């Protein structure tokens, strides 16, 4: 398949701290330095035949290969596929106003059987985003339909999902236009027909800082963003 030049603003991490099943006001900023204490399980929410599902599995393999090559034991966990979906309206509204969470969106994330919830939306009115939700110990990754691109290539979906999973692992933006974690409107990507954009040397060092060679998963699901035991989430 030929490479396609696509201009896409990938830089869109938003935060939410939902703690009840009613629409609510939320802090604006995501927790910094998100680090998993265990192996996070992946749950895909989409139709059964969604063309983006293989791209997710490839992106998970990418993020498991990177720590392995660096000598870290950290991995993303098993991937499950649920035919439940999150409405495009809920995702669009949350992306536009992340301080407000609709009950239906909160319940969908809370009930999903996984730690990293990847919602493959049939809507295209928002950019991809990743949102840590410490109160329910989950991370929401929302991916739009890509219908606005006449011939979306597998390289587009694969790299967009991998970019968002980079946030879920704990990385942030950089300004290197040809790297995977470049964020913002200045990133003009020619998506490769095979494989992924690379991580920078600094990002590889950051991964080893977060998940060093002696890193081992612990039984309880706790991450740095969690409140201390015995306090409200």
PLM ranges: what are they?
Residues 139-149, 155-156, 172-233:
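Metalloprotease/metallohydrolase-associated module, dominated by Zn2+-dependent proteases
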